[in-house]
């Protein structure tokens, strides 16, 4: 096992060691990327100043041991070791996930350092940052393809852009942090790379091979654990100043809202990575338009009642004293007189409704005798009862006979005979 090899994380405890992919130096072949206990790489023998490193590998532990037990069994002491690209140009590669091409697997990992020879990285040790002329000794591998981390945005790797990296046992910040600035360095020149590594432009968004897809605050933690015990985890800290970046590389810090931070870098599987879309909606803050003015009142129309009444043939006195019409009184009287004449012609002469008591008594009457009765009428039409002996009957000028009480009452209200409708008052005068 090489001392700088790292293993894929999020493997279940029962996963065999052969399924975990490791990364090696630039001189290793693709077949040597699979970790085996018997292989030794160029990084197996570090520089001469690390003399206290053990020469053989510690005994391998069963793969089913949890990470907490491995951390508990890790040694507490060790000699400090400096990591700098000038002294060690071996690449530092991480296989984030091997199954990313099979589906949208969320990248939720925690970055930890892994050592295979048992020497720790003490807390006080500083890891100097790299400049733009020197590529960092680290890269990320997605499904067998290597991604140089120094070309990615600064929040992805803190060892290349930040000031220092002390190694306390704390949690590593998010892979894509919520810093208030987005670092935009100028595009560096493509450095020479080994044959087994893919070209730099294939993964960096310097070319237009892959579409730029924004990732909005992916809360991802990369956890890199190997078979060997881990002694600490990288932690971003700005408590002490570190080596400054090269003055030839100007850095432009652009202010940006942390809630809407977008980092764009081309990755072949960027469309498979989970992204948290911003659901904040902006509402247009504009004052509401003033309400429309009320409609104007309808125009005043004078009443048509006086005009309508003036068209009627009526006298102004009948309308009442409140209505005064400018009409000639003589003309009105003449019209009324003519109207009355027309009415009299249609009605005829005015006659009283009934006969007076004197007129009624002038009509002849007699006592009914059945033996001497000569008329064919035997009953009274008013009361519809038969004549009886010794009853008083009244005879009208039309020779119709009735009971005296019945016909007198009828003649007081009517002037005609109840049977033939003849005038009861004319006949006697003509007879006289």
Swiss-Prot record:
CDD domains registered for this protein in UniProt? RING-H2_RNF44
SUPFAM superfamilies assigned: RING/U-box
Q: Ranges of Pro residues compositional bias?
A: 56-65
**A molecular function (GO) term:** ubiquitin protein ligase activity
Q: Does the keyword Metal-binding apply?
A: yes
Gene3D superfamilies listed in its UniProt record: Zinc/RING finger domain, C3HC4 (zinc finger) (3.30.40.10)
**Name used for this protein in its record:** RING finger protein 44
Q: Please tell me the species this chain comes from.
A: Homo sapiens (Human)
């Amino acid at each position: 096992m090489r001392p700088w090899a790292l293993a894929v994380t999020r493997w279940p405890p029962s996963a065999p060691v052969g399924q975990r992919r490791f990364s090696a130096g630039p001189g290793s072949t693709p077949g040597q990327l699979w970790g085996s206990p018997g292989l030794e790489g160029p990084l197996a023998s570090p520089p001469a100043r690390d003399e206290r490193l053990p020469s053989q590998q510690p005994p391998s532990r069963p793969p089913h041991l949890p990470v907490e037990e491995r951390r508990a069994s890790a040694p507490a002491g060790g000699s400090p070791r400096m990591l700098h690209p000038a002294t060690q140009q071996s690449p530092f590669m991480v296989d984030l996930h091997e199954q990313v091409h099979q589906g949208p697997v969320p990248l939720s990992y925690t970055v930890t350092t892994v050592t295979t020879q048992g020497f720790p990285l003490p807390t006080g040790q500083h890891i100097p940052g790299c400049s733009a002329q020197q590529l960092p000794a680290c890269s990320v591998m997605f499904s067998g393809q290597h991604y140089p981390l120094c070309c990615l945005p600064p929040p992805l790797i803190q060892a290349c852009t930040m000031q220092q990296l002390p190694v306390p046992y704390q949690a590593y910040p998010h892979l894509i942090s919520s810093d208030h600035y987005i670092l935009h360095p100028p595009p560096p020149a493509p450095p020479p790379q080994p044959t087994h590594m893919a070209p730099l432009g294939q993964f960096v968004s310097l070319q237009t091979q892959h579409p730029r897809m924004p990732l909005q605050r992916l809360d991802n933690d990369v956890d890199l654990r190997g078979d060997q015990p881990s002694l600490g985890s990288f932690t971003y800290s700005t408590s002490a100043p570190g080596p400054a970046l090269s003055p030839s590389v100007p850095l432009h810090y652009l202010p940006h809202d942390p809630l809407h931070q977008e980092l764009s870098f081309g990755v072949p599987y960027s469309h498979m990575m989970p992204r948290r879309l911003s659901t904040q909606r902006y509402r247009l803050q504009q004052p509401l338009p003033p309400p429309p003015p009320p409609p104007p009142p309808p125009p005043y129309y004078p009443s048509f009642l006086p005009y309508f009444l003036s068209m009627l043939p009526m006298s102004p006195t009948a309308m009442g004293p409140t209505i005064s019409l400018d009409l000639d009184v003589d003309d009105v009287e003449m019209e009324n007189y003519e109207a009355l004449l027309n009415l009299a012609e249609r009605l005829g002469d005015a006659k009283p409704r009934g006969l007076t008591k004197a007129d009624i008594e002038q009509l002849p009457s007699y006592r009914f005798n059945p033996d001497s009765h000569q008329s064919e009428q035997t009953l009274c039409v008013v009361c519809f009862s038969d004549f009886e002996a010794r009853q008083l009957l009244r005879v009208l000028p039309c020779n119709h006979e009735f009971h005296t009480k019945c016909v007198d009452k009828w003649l007081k209200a009517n002037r005609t005979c109840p049977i033939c409708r003849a005038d009861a008052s004319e006949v006697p005068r003509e007879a006289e």
